[in-house]
Amino acid sequence: AWNYSYADAFVILKYTFTNATEDTIQDIYAGIWADPSIANFNYTDIYTPGGGFSWYDNLNGFDETEDDAEFKRDIAYQYDTDGDDGWAESYLGMSALGSNVPYNYLNTNYFQWVWTNSNNSDYPAYSMPLTDEERYDKMSSSVPKGTGPDYTSEGYPAAENSWMFLLSA
């Protein structure tokens, strides 16, 4: 994204929100939805290793750990679980880097769901929002973490699929 080798693998987006009315906005959340589809899109021969539609073997997560300076990472991410035999070893991560609100007070939320799945019977809490009210609910809180063999050690679904995610604050 930049003209320097040390900075060629990221993009920073800056958004400005303006209240065009005299009313005070209450309880606002801003979010960005992503369909990362981590896969090799340049190699599509389905009969060759790494080819075909290979984005149905992805997993998502949300890194809430702190670095050495006690700065929360809050990174939503997706990766290809098997790397498609070397053809799709990439990943994608997104984080809210700041706002007019000091970062210590910025509450970052994370949600995920399967592509086109508004009724996820395997993971009922991980369903796609369909209405404005459902979208607001998803942006105002994080998805509940699960335990057991159906979940990763971080508490997110362990079933590979074409997962979407929503990062909001």
Where is each model-derived feature located?
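Asparagine-centered strand-capping/turn motif at beta-strand->loop junctions
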Residues: T16-E22
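Glycine-rich (often Gly-Gly/Gly-Pro-rich) flexible segments and glycine-rich loop motifs
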Residues: Q26-Y156
